[in-house]
Amino acid sequence: MYLNDTLKNKARKPQLELQPRQKCWTRLPLRRLFATNIGYTSANNAPHNCRAHWKPWGVAFVVAAFCALPHAVMGQDEPENKGLTLRGSIQTDMLVPENDKQTGATKANGDFLNNTYVELGASLKNIDVGLRLEYLQYPLPGFEPDFKGWGVPHYYIKWQTKRMELTAGTFYEQFGSGFVLRTYEERSLGIDNSLLGGRLKVNPLPGVFVKALAGKQRRYWEHNDDWVAGGDLELNIEQWLPGMQEHDHYLMLGASVVNKNEPDEVIMTDASHRLRLPRNVMAYDVRARWQHGAYNVLAEYAQKGQDPTADNGYIYRHGYVAMLSGSYSKQGLSLLLQAKRSVNMGFRSRRSMMGTSSSINHLPAFTLEHTYALPAMRPYATQPLGEWAYQASLGYKLKKGTALGGRYGTALKLNFSHVHGIDQNVHGTKGTDGYGSAFWAWGDATYYQDLNLQMEKQWSHALKTTLMYMNQRYNKTVVEGEGGMIHANIFVADVKWKMSPRTTLRTEAQYLQSKDDDGDWLFGLLELSLAPSWMFTVSDQYNSGSTRTHYYQALVTFSHGAHRLQVGYGRTKDGYNCSGGVCRYIPATKGATLSYSYNF
């Protein structure tokens, strides 16, 4: 979620709705196929308005498509089953929680927690069908009670030719950089904002790509009643001008439009006045990408109409985002420069929702996503109400055989990111346009800043080291709701030793120095890999500042073919799991874990 939406009161667990909804005691609805419910809801001890019922037409839709595939093959003048492809996957993550007074971990949600996903798909010639079963009857910590349930929320049938693709059912889509539309699944964050409806993709001419779609957006185990519709056009100009390709020039022009249709509702400004809410909110996006040799430049601008929502305090200010990104890359050298300004660009299919629920678009964070534990401890969450964001990244590889490069060469990476608030001239509240903001004007607050330098050096065939330094400024008040500015210096050393062709030992040592928040942190990790199947990992994250708490973990991982099994035991610190500037708060845990995945 965008953290400041729901975390201003940390004692309260994140809730994604402003008003509570009455729930069935046991709620396991699957989902509608268009206007038809599919699934089962238990009536035991349920409120009088919750009824047990089966309406399996949606499941029958996909099952029939699966069953029809072999018969379709038999009807061809080809050997039976030629061209039929079946695929699937299973992923399950389990936790047996324990109470832990020192970390605050509890087993309040049950003695056994589990998130399980099973996907099945089949394709024959130009027909593709698929479905996904999800079981979250006892969801993992950090997932709201609305996730509780099981069902088949994802199912589709797709028909594809050389120039056209037609999808009916649920689907994911992105227009451009996602400023006006991005639907996607991110299981670790509990995000699945897919659309249930139809989508058409057409490539009528070389270099011309058209998309059109309409649907209702998923919200937990339901779909909002509001409609989302849109279209996208991309033109690859070099396809029409052969001279451009001959001189290694490529130009893409794109445009998108998205509309959300939402009925009126009662939102009061005071005891006697209510808001007049727009039924349709339009958003537009235009973009251009130019490539030549090692150079790549992208410019994109999106704008949204008046859209009073719970996110922005029900103001009527137009929203927009402008982005400019340039990169250069050749052997041994890479450079990235980016800048982005966004104002009031949260976009949801349901205006009263907050957190991650019902988001139509996506605003990427111009900050580096770290993989080491301490640098990743305080990630940045994009602020949809407005921000200026900048990022610069430089990569350089010192040549082999030089004094600094050594025998195998040395890779250097320098990254700097800075996110700042926008200037706001506030002149109104709910029911007005809220504030004015000059385009180039900064606000008073720095939201986030990260300067990091990383060096990777291969000393020999068996030994490799990675060293990293990071200076971080993290505005906890802006991102989480309280806490002030946190300054930290972080040091990382990673040593990888290939002891034999099948045995590798990797160690990590990390130190975070800070006079703010919880003070200093230490982290250590030892990882032994026995190829091709086994990996043993032990780690400890220790707060040497105010809490003096150890967060230890032990993991054993076994891989064989498409199977992967991991079992473990330990503690995890409360914090934020983020991806692309979208975050979810995860409470502290202690207990045994098991994860299994399989693909076929």
Predicted regions and their residues:
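Beta-barrel outer-membrane channel/assembly domains of diderm bacteria
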Residues: 59, 74-173, 179-180, 195-214, ...
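Exposed, low-structure sequence patches enriched in small/polar residues
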Residues: 91, 106, 113, 244-248, ...
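Polybasic, lysine-rich low-complexity intrinsically disordered segments
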Residues: 9, 13, 23-24
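Bacterial N-terminal signal peptides
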Residues: 58-70
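Tryptophan (W) side chains
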Residues: 25, 54-57
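Outer-membrane beta-barrel proteins
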Residues: 140, 144-147, 220-223, 304-317
